[in-house]
Amino acid sequence: MLTDALAPRATIPQRLDRLPLTWTLWRLGLVTQAGWAVVVATDAIAARIYPFVWGPRHAFDTAAFSILLLVSTGVGIVAGEYFFAVLSDRFGRRTTLLAAAATCGLGTLPAGFVDDFWLLTLSLGIGAMGIGGVLATCTVYLAEVAPSQARGRMTQTSQAFAIFLLAVLTSLPGILLMPEHYQAYVVLMAAGPLLVLVPLVAFVLPESPRWLDVHGRHEQAEAVVSMLERDCETRAGPLPAPITGDVAPQSQATVRDLFGPEYRRRTVLLFACWLLGYSGLVYGVIGFLNLYLARVGFSARAVFISGLISGVVGGAAGLLAAARLNERVERRAVILAGALVACLGLVLVFLTGEVWHSLPALSIAAVILNAGAYLWLFNMYTYTAVAYPTRIRSVGTGWTDGFGHVGSIVSPLIVGALFTATAHVGYIGFFGYVIIPGALLPALLIARFGIKQKAAPLETVAGA
């Protein structure tokens, strides 16, 4: 058999990189990205409820809402990413996903039954820790099982599925339940990690063979890779010979390597870009766009309808188009293109609120915004995971993406202040911040100073 003949001469990464894209690998990608979707559905849930429930009830004011966002989209996620990243590199990707998913669901659930500011902050803060853990681990797992020549196609197609699922999970129940039955809405969001992700991870995902290999569990890594090879051969026929001899063995690596001579530059660059992007294009928009739309007169139903359309059409279509490019276009260029498209969408949202004020116009603007924002976000996820070697990949992703979530901590303070200060002139402070330092600047930095990743073996890129 081809697998047995090649096993003594090929490393685990080389054998993974020659696997064809069959249902064997698609299944792993779809499960990890379904995990991303069900936990992100709980992320910033306060921003979907406050404009239509807690705000009109005067449960707490806009300043307290900003603090709630600071904890539930910032502090909690940062703490979770760092904590679960360490667990992931020590105990494995699969075990960490199970623990983080349970934390997310159990933490979010009480938010459907209280409107006290402090109890909400505690509940959503704990849930956010689980979100951070899943974010830090899902991307790493997907990067480690995706073959290098098809990494872009596999990751971005799986991510397009995740965006479609996220749009349906957050918007369709919102159309049917918000604001009258918001408690049921929260319960549905919390049920996703507990009743969907936990069983999928427990019964479908094997442990990452790359993680097993670098942690000395060679027999387990061999068993997982052999199983994947057998399944792929059954579906696609004999496997091609792996490319050997071009990848140098990885040396022992620690967290200190993130700041050592080899990785310091890329770590600092990712710190800066995630910090700016999370403060603006991601959590600046997530935290305050719904509030802006409510202030200019859009109903909850209109906001959730536009969210469903933009998520299904915009986000998924953008990533599917990028997946067709596979690894033929440098990832840095795709990140920049995503930021430019998102900025165009934000300008159109502003014009919709100030001039056109119609659901069709809002939906078109939101489609363009989501297409660009998700293109930027998911390519940044993949770029970050691929930038580090396997032994520190989870910690590297967790540290850089986690530090970037400091942007989600400062975002409610900066964006919230600009939002309030420029309310009389169309909230242009909000739009100006999320467009310039929050989207364009980080994309330009990656395009100018980032490393090349196009179609390169994972170990070669990480060690470059």
Where are these regions (language model features)?
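Transmembrane-helix signature of 12-pass secondary carriers
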Residues: 1-464
